[in-house]
């Protein structure tokens, strides 16, 4: 913006240093290095360059700011406070305290103005790439020649640690290839990591690294010079190169505390003991948590300037809605909630022949869902041909086709997971992503953050057991499903036939308060007994009775996915006093009423056997000390899938034998 008051911005930068020092000192915990070293970056962005509205934090066309180096959270909280967001001085005083708005690392939903949950290094830059992708999709879908309602920038602040993490390379490679020119990376290049100087662990040329993947690079040698930073931002914002941008800022970690500045001791809270002298060095008064009247006045005026831009956009938006009622209706639909039962009605019942794999059933289910939810997008880590989650009526997302609904993430599972989170943070698109279940370990940190942040993403993970067969134990998950069930707020659904799969996808696409993981087979599975309606409705409750006993109940067989068929066959051999329960989603079943759970698994029947082609430990919560679990507590082997299953005891015959022991 014109008429830059550099004195005011420099004063604000120093006052955020004071806020950060006081907050970390009061908490006796936290990180000073980035908030002090990057204060001028904050001044250039929040005090001049970013377009935002603190009164409308979800404004559709705001610029996004993601703090990838989440340990520097006081940087963000300080600037949000000055910028007029609902982050008070009292909130800053409660930094890292119980139930505060200012947790140790930024958390989506907890703090107004925080765009992404960050802290695990590298996640934020991949989140930003996902957000930038979603912004491209939105612009492609909704902008017209007359009205550009989406033209924002996505800014992410990264440090040396973020860029050492492998996920960063996956993310920037995607961004460069897809020419995400709405992405601007600020690299706080202070040459220091927690343990030592960065030169002890890296010697790469950052300029060449980013240029090689398609970024336009600017190097700001005086990374604490506000004028240089603003100029660099404006150059990046108005670049005609069609490339994503990175501004490498050579900064001094913990600037303002000479005793630790420029060293690894400045990373954490070690500098707290020197803050009294630092306050004098920075020209700050002795008063703690001090913000001057001049700084508050500056930001009040700045907010008024931003409000003008906001109102201008609102006028354009109103014109756009009037001129494009169908597009306006589509945009509004992004915020509509959908019930699983309504989504499920869009999916025709399956013919009972031929038998098919649940991954194939998933493909058949995805097509009507994608028509019903036109703002849904689906991606894969170079496995669309195997995971079968390609939206057939949607083209590929490319620079030339930003409206494409199929995202080719490439063989970048970790970035895929974090980019999916970014698309979900954006909020307009329902995103799913696919790979083989065994490779979920590559993106588990992103799955965990999706669950923590209550992001409604959908994971479509196929080839879900030793039934994979010939590829062998490297590709045969055994511990994976149980491990994923341990993540709070993640619903894991392992359907047993196409009708259960229809309900599973409906649940996943309806869920708005967290992620859902679909575990699907490579191998064909028979249809379970019962009507499509019974199986679908039962799946919506997480677990249900597939085969009812016709004599006094003697035993309950519990299974998921490909093993339910063995329980059904075993029940035929064991007698009419056997009940078979399919439990595709234990998390959902656990959320049912006690009355319903007792109707399916009555506590009076303690003779229970659970069967799943994976580790056994998880299932004892359902079978109890008197029950048995048939599973696989070892790695698999390379052979045809049926042979591996038989060798490892995943058969109805083995189930019958164990039931008699």
Curated annotation (Swiss-Prot):
Its cofactor is Mg(2+); Ca(2+); Mn(2+); Co(2+). It catalyses: D-sedoheptulose 7-phosphate + D-glyceraldehyde 3-phosphate = aldehydo-D-ribose 5-phosphate + D-xylulose 5-phosphate. GO terms for cellular component: cytosol; phagocytic vesicle. One of its GO terms (molecular function) is transketolase activity. Thiamine diphosphate binds at residues 71, 119-121, 161, 190, 267, 439. SUPFAM superfamilies: Thiamin diphosphate-binding fold (THDP-binding) (SSF52518), TK C-terminal domain-like (SSF52922). Binds 1 Mg(2+) ion per subunit. Can also utilize other divalent metal cations, such as Ca(2+), Mn(2+) and Co(2+). Binds 1 thiamine pyrophosphate per subunit. Coiled coil: none annotated. Pfam families: Transket_pyr, Transketolase_C_1, Transketolase_N. Substrate binds at residues 31, 267, 359, 386, 463, 471, 522. The keyword S-adenosyl-L-methionine does not apply. Mg(2+) binds at residues 160, 190, 192. Keywords: Acetylation, Calcium, Magnesium, Metal-binding, Thiamine pyrophosphate, Transferase. The active site is at residue 413. Its EC number is 2.2.1.1. It is an enzyme of class 2 (transferase). CDD domains: TPP_PYR_DXS_TK_like, TPP_TK. The record marks 31, 267 as: Important for catalytic activity. The keyword Metal-binding applies. GO terms for biological process: pentose-phosphate shunt. The modification N-acetylserine is found at residue 2. Belongs to the transketolase family. Catalyzes the transfer of a two-carbon ketol group from a ketose donor to an aldose acceptor, via a covalent intermediate with the cofactor thiamine pyrophosphate. Homodimer. This is Transketolase.
């Amino acid at each position: 913006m014109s008429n830059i008051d550099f004195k005011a911005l420099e004063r604000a930068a120093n006052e955020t240093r004071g806020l950060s020092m006081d907050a970390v000192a009061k908490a006796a915990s936290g990180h000073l290095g980035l908030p002090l070293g990057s204060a001028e970056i904050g001044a250039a962005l929040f005090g001049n360059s970013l377009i935002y509205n603190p009164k409308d934090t979800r404004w559709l066309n705001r610029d996004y700011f993601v703090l990838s180096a989440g340990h520097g959270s006081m940087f963000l909280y300080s600037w949000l406070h000055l910028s007029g967001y609902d982050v008070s001085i009292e909130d800053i005083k409660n930094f890292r305290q119980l139930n505060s708005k200012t947790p140790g690392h930024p958390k989506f939903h907890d703090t107004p103005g925080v765009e992404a949950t960050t802290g695990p290094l590298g996640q934020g830059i991949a989140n930003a790439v996902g957000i930038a992708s979603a912004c491209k999709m939105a612009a492609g879908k909704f902008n017209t020649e007359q009205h550009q309602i989406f033209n924002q920038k996505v800014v992410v602040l990264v440090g040396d640690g973020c860029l050492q993490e492998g996920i960063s390379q996956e993310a920037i490679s995607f961004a460069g290839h897809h020419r995400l020119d709405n992405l601007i990376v600020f690299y706080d290049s202070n040459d220091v990591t927690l343990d030592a100087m960065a030169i002890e662990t890296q010697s790469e040329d950052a300029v060449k690294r980013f240029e090689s993947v398609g970024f336009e690079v600017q190097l700001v040698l005086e990374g604490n010079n506000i004028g240089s930073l603003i100029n660099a931002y404006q150059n990046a914002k108005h670049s005609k190169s069609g490339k994503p941008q990175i501004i490498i800022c050579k900064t001094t970690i913990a600037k303002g505390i000479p005793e630790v500045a420029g060293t690894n001791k400045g990373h954490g809270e070690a500098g707290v003991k020197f803050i009294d002298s630092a306050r004098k060095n920075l020209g700050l008064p002795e008063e703690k948590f001090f913000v001057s009247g001049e700084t508050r006045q500056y930001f009040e005026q700045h907010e008024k300037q931003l409000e003008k831009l906001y109102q201008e956009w609102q006028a354009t938006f109103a014109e756009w809605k009037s001129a494009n009622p169908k597009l306006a209706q589509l945009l509004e639909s992004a915020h509509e909630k959908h019930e699983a039962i309504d989504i499920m009605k869009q999916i025709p019942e399956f013919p009972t022949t031929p038998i098919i794999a649940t991954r194939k059933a998933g493909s058949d289910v995805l097509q009507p869902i994608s028509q019903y939810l036109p703002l849904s997008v689906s991606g894969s880590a170079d496995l669309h041909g195997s995971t079968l989650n390609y939206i057939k009526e949607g083209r590929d997302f490319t620079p030339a086709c930003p409206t494409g609904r199929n995202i080719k993430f490439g063989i970048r599972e970790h970035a895929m997971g974090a980019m999916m989170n970014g698309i979900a943070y954006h909020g307009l698109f329902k995103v799913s992503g696919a790979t083989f279940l065994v490779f979920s370990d590559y993106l588990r940190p992103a799955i965990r953050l999706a669950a923590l942040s209550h992001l409604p993403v959908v994971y479509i993970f196929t080839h879900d057991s030793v039934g994979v067969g010939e590829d062998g134990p490297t590709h045969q998950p055994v511990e994976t499903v149980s491990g994923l069930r341990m993540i709070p707020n993640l619903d894991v659904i392992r359907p047993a036939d196409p009708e259960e799969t229809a309900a599973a996808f409906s649940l996943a696409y309806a869920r708005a308060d967290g992620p859902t993981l679909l575990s699907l087979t490579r191998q064909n599975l028979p249809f379970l007994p019962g009507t499509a309606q019974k199986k679908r409705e039962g799946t919506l409750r997480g677990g249900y009775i597939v085969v009812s006993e016709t004599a006094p109940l003697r035993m309950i067989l519990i299974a998921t996915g490909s093993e339910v068929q063995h329980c059904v066959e075993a029940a035929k051999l064991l007698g009419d006093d056997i009940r078979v329960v399919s439990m595709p989603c234990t998390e959902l079943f656990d959320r049912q009423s006690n009355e319903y759970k007792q109707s399916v698994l009555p506590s009076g029947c303690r003779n229970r056997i659970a069967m799943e082609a994976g580790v056994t430990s998880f299932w004892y919560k359902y079978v109890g000390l008197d029950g048995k679990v048939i599973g696989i507590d070892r790695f698999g082997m390379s052979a045809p899938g049926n042979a591996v299953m038989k060798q490892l005891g995943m058969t109805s015959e083995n189930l019958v034998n164990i039931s008699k022991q």
